[in-house]
């Protein structure tokens, strides 16, 4: 079911303590970033399991971001933060900050003329290279098989190091450590395979 737009979401987010409103905002090293956080299910669970680390989620839709913000407040998480913006506008202040970036079920932009909007296009890869720490990693999950294959080709073309990959995460050796998004849970329950790749800029 499609989420109904909350016209007051932006205003409500202004009063949420875990929403980053002013930049630059200092984030400690050894932090994790999720781009396209959605309702925050995966990132909030990771924050609960790893209270010694900082977790930041980017979500451009206020209605969805507010759900995550309220959930984090209820759980009294002090290591979880939200940026409500588009990825291209939000990352200028985080050079060398993140040890791990998650790209979770981002828009595959299936039309060929939109390929430059895909979050594994070279323009975005350059952004990630700047905000990752020296030994930082990127992990991607997607249910879109065509986007996954295109991503693998983009990574190879741009000289990145593919560390691990699978076209069926649920049946792979990586499943035991996988924390699911709400979107992911839905598609796994329907029998849809989930593609996964882990990569870095360091050879």
Swiss-Prot record:
Transmembrane segments: none annotated. GO terms for cellular component: tRNA methyltransferase complex. CDD domains: AdoMet_MTases. GO terms for molecular function: tRNA (guanine(46)-N7)-methyltransferase activity. S-adenosyl-L-methionine binds at residues 34, 59, 86, 107. It is an enzyme of class 2 (transferase). It holds the Pfam family Methyltransf_4. Keywords: Methyltransferase, S-adenosyl-L-methionine, Transferase, tRNA processing. Pathway: tRNA modification; N(7)-methylguanine-tRNA biosynthesis. The active site is at residue 107. Substrate binds at residues 111, 143, 181-184. Its EC number is 2.1.1.33. The keyword Methyltransferase applies. It catalyses: guanosine(46) in tRNA + S-adenosyl-L-methionine = N(7)-methylguanosine(46) in tRNA + S-adenosyl-L-homocysteine. Gene3D superfamilies: Vaccinia Virus protein VP39. Catalyzes the formation of N(7)-methylguanine at position 46 (m7G46) in tRNA. Belongs to the class I-like SAM-binding methyltransferase superfamily. TrmB family. This is tRNA (guanine-N(7)-)-methyltransferase.
């Amino acid at each position: 079911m499609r989420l109904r737009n909350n016209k007051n979401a932006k205003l409500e987010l202004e009063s949420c303590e875990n929403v980053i409103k002013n930049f630059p905002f200092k984030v400690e090293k050894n932090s994790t970033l999720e781009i396209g956080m959605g309702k925050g299910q995966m990132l909030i669970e990771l924050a609960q399991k790893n209270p010694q680390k900082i977790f930041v989620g980017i979500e451009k839709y206020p209605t969805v971001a507010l759900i995550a913000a309220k959930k984090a407040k209820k759980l009294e998480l002090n290591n979880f933060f939200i940026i409500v913006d588009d990825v291209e506008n939000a990352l200028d202040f985080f050079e060398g900050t993140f040890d791990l970036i998650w790209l979770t079920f981002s828009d595959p932009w299936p039309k060929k003329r939109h390929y430059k909007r895909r979050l594994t296009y070279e323009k975005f890869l350059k952004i990630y290279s700047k905000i990752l720490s020296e030994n930082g990693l990127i992990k991607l999950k997607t249910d879109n098989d065509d986007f996954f294959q295109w991503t693998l080709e983009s990574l190879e073309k741009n000289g990145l190091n593919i560390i691990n990959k699978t076209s069926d995460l649920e049946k792979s050796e990586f499943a035991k450590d996988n924390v699911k998004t709400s979107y992911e849970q839905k598609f796994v329950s329907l029998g849809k395979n989930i593609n996964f790749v882990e990569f870095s800029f360091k050879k």
